[in-house]
Amino acid sequence: MSKPIVAIVGRPNVGKSTLFNKLIGQRLAIVEDTPGVTRDRLYGNCEWQNHNFLLVDTGGIEPSVDDGILLHMRQQAQLAIDTAQAILFVTDLRAGVTAQDADIANMLMRSGKPVVLVVNKVDSLGAPPLELYDFYSLGLGEPYPVSSVHGHGTGDILEKICEYLPDQREEVEEDDRITDVSYTHLQGKSCGTAGLL
C-alpha cells in the first residue's frame, strides 16, 4: 500500500523547510533566510498516532513571477499539490496576509484538496495574537498558530491533517490477508521504487 502524501506549500521564507524538519524529526531540508534555497520537492516520512505518510517540502511559490528558477519551483510545488491527499499551507504571522498568500489560497481552493492553514512564527505561548484572525480572510477556514522553530502547535496541525488521510488501521487488516506470493511481489516492487523518491 502506498503512503498518503501531504504537501507543504507557501510563499518563500515563511518557514516551510523548518516546519518540514520539525514534523519529520530530523534536519533533512536546508534552512536559510534566503529565498529559493528549496527548489525541488523533498520527501520525508512522518508518523502521527496511527498515521504514516509522506511529507513533501516545496520551494516558495511566487504566483506572478515567470523567470526560470522561480517558474521551476512553482511547477514543482504544483506537482506536489496534484499528488497530495492534503495540503499544509504555511503563512507568516509577522508579515501578515500578503497578496501572494491570497493568490496561493485561490490556487489551493481550485485544486479541491483539503487544506490546513498554518500561521507560522507564533513563537510565544498563551492566547493567540489578534493578527491571527486576519488570516480568516484567505477563505480557508481556521488558521492554526505554529512555531516551527519551537514546535508549538505542531500537534494540532498533525491532528487536523490526519482527519483527511485514510484510516491506516483498516489497511493493515487488509495487508494481513495478502498471500506470501503477492507479498513477495509487492515487496520487490516497493524495493524498486524506493530509490526513485
Question: What are these regions, as identified by a protein language model?
Answer:
Residues 8, 31, 182, 196:
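Hydrophobic anchor at the beta1->P-loop junction of P-loop NTPases
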Residues 11, 22, 34:
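P-loop (Walker A) phosphate-binding loop of NTP-binding proteins
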Residues 15, 153, 192:
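Conserved glycine(s) of the Walker
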Residues 78-141:
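Conserved C-terminal guanine-recognition region of P-loop GTPase G domains, centered on the G4
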Residues 124-172:
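Canonical P-loop GTPase G-domain recognition
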Residues 184-189:
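Conserved small/polar residues in nucleotide/adenosyl-binding loops
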